[in-house]
């Protein structure tokens, strides 16, 4: 399996980021998160964050988090700041982004180079 990803960290939370905006979340995401998150044996991370197409009108994207144990999380402040930076550097260069999460719509604002506030 060939997989394009970005690994980012925010305040010691490190995740593997997948662009799922057009392809959708992989069907085996729970097993994939467990496999790729294993430190010393694979990429190693706190889990996988999928950057998906938004579900709320006016949102820029949706963030879905899959922890290293394969469970789905609702929200991660450090993770969403990295999603904002990823979106900003991959064509959505807006200083304020609206990102869907399982905890609702979150607004993330650019405070400076690589600095974001939720």
Show which residues each predicted segment covers.
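A glycine-rich beta-to-alpha transition motif near the start of alpha/beta enzyme domains, typified by
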Residues: 1-112
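Short, solvent-exposed secondary-structure boundary/capping segments
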Residues: 114-118
């Amino acid at each position: 399996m060939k997989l394009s990803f970005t690994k980012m960290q925010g305040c010691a939370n490190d995740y593997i980021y997948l662009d799922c905006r057009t392809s959708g979340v992989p069907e085996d995401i729970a097993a994939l998160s467990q496999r790729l998150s294993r430190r010393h044996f694979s990429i190693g991370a706190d889990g996988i964050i999928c950057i998906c197409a938004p579900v709320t009108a006016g949102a820029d994207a949706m963030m879905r988090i899959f922890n290293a144990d394969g469970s789905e999380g609702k929200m991660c402040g450090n993770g969403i700041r990295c999603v904002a930076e990823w979106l900003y550097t991959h064509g959505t260069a807006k200083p304020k982004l609206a990102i869907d999460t399982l905890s609702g719509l979150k607004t993330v604002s650019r405070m400076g180079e690589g600095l974001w506030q939720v």
